[in-house]
Regions:
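Short, well-formed alpha-helical segments that are part of the catalytic scaffolds
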Residues: 11-28
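Glycine-rich, basic loop-to-helix element that forms the pyrophosphate-binding segment
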Residues: 71-90
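Short, flexible, basic/aromatic active-site loop/helix in glycosyltransferases
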Residues: 123-124, 136-155, 227
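A conserved acidic beta->alpha catalytic loop
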Residues: 41-51, 103
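Conserved donor NDP-sugar-binding/catalytic core segment of glycosyltransferases
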Residues: 108-135
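Acidic donor-binding loop at a coil-to-helix junction in glycosyltransferase catalytic cores
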Residues: 180-186
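Acidic helix N-cap motif at the loop->helix transition within catalytic regions
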Residues: 13-16, 47-56, 108
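Short beta-strand-to-loop acidic/aromatic patch adjacent to the donor-nucleotide binding site
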Residues: 91-104
């Protein structure tokens, strides 16, 4: 079995698109019907995120894809990812794939992670809509295209596009219960145990450039820092 973990904090608006993409990826013919467990960890959600999941579970039936969710009250993305991973490991999954609620994976996402035949896959991200930043959108699009290395051999670490073999995850100790950089800390732990890595641009995801980032210090805040620096330079 394969497992996918998605942390969510007030993601009512983004979850439908995220789940739709995950169901397609989890149903890819190349997986040959292997069961894929999708687990969403609702962390201090005060919106209709759980209602979205309930409706989705009722309407989308699949022989090889199962959706579940749990709730925590930590406001820490590291705690959410760790909680979801532990639940899936208890179901004996062999591979853990991680993404975010504001991210949509490609149809080949899981297949391409597994095809690399390593312990850890660190993928890159793409942004296709910079409009939340209004007047700064063109500048951000240009800055991202010029500075972001979206090729094999990159050294980006994104919780929105990460895959880890279950055995390696256990050996490394899993995610730390931290509010941000949990992905960076996990990758460092995986490097220390000698895990085999692929720094690949093959497994594709598209993430948002929203201005109301959920994890302080994460990708969204990095974008806001670029905007702030550009504004200060004017």
């Amino acid at each position: 079995m394969l497992g996918i973990v998605i942390p969510a904090h007030n993601e009512e608006a983004c979850l439908p698109g995220c789940l739709a993409a995950l169901y397609v990826a989890a149903s890819h013919p190349a997986l040959r019907g292997e069961t894929v467990l999708i687990h969403v960890v609702l962390d201090h959600c005060e919106d209709g995120s759980e209602d979205v999941l309930k409706r989705w579970q009722q309407r989308r039936q699949s022989a090889c894809v199962a959706l579940s969710w749990s709730q925590i009250d930590k406001r820490k993305v590291g705690a959410a990812r760790a909680s979801g991973a532990n639940r899936l490991l208890a179901r004996d999954v062999r591979w853990l794939a991680f993404t975010d609620a504001d991210t949509q994976v490609s149809p080949e996402w899981l297949v391409q992670q597994l095809a690399l035949e390593v312990d850890v896959v660190c993928g890159s991200v793409a942004v296709d809509d910079w409009s939340p930043h209004a007047g700064q959108a063109a500048m951000l699009r240009t800055h991202f295209s010029q500075t972001y290395n979206d090729r094999d051999g990159h050294r980006h670490i994104h919780g929105a596009n990460l895959g880890v073999a279950a055995d390696a995850y256990r050996k490394a100790g899993g995610f730390q219960s931290v509010p941000c950089h949990e992905d960076v800390y996990l990758v460092a732990a995986l490097e220390r145990i000698g895990a085999r890595f692929a720094w690949s641009a093959a497994p594709r995801v598209v993430t948002s450039a929203r201005t109301d980032a959920r994890a302080r210090g994460g990708f969204g805040d990095t974008i806001l820092a670029v905007v702030a620096a550009a504004t200060a330079a004017l």
